[in-house]
Amino acid sequence: MNAEAKPGDWLGKVRWDANGLVPVIAQDAATNDVLMFAWMNRDALAKTIELKRAVYYSRSRQRLWFKGEESGHVQHVHEVRLDCDEDVVLLKVEQVEGIACHTGRRSCFFQKFEGTVDDGEWVAVDPVLKDPEHIYK
């Protein structure tokens, strides 16, 4: 347990990294499929709990990122879990329109390794459900 956490200080229980971030996995609440990986800071996690909607922290834009703010592919949060080391958050979500990835796919994990260590490659195995050019206008 995080020694710095005080009773009632649920944000203090999380083991934030040196940049004040925690990795987050979004998982489909109905199927348990892994949809995506992202980051949260304290504000993002607090907003996620408050709104019951996934809010992440964009490291490239240095700001909160409300999932679906541009695409409409919102994630309604059904459950929030913290792993045994208290340094990874799991969101069980309902993915609006079934598209979590900016590539227009259901999951960001659409590339599968095939082959051997000597001749392997990453192959896209999941279909594009919607052309990203029609998602981000």
From Swiss-Prot:
Q: What is its EC number?
A: 3.5.4.19
Keywords on this record? Amino-acid biosynthesis, Cytoplasm, Histidine biosynthesis, Hydrolase, Magnesium, Metal-binding, Zinc
Please tell me where Zn(2+) binds in this chain.
84, 101, 108
The cofactors it requires, by name, are: Mg(2+); Zn(2+)
GO: which molecular function terms?
magnesium ion binding; phosphoribosyl-AMP cyclohydrolase activity; zinc ion binding
Describe the function of this protein.
Catalyzes the hydrolysis of the adenine ring of phosphoribosyl-AMP.
Provide the assembly information.
Homodimer.
**What protein am I looking at?**
Phosphoribosyl-AMP cyclohydrolase
Species lineage: Bacteria, Pseudomonadati, Pseudomonadota, Betaproteobacteria, Burkholderiales
Q: Which gene codes for it?
A: hisI
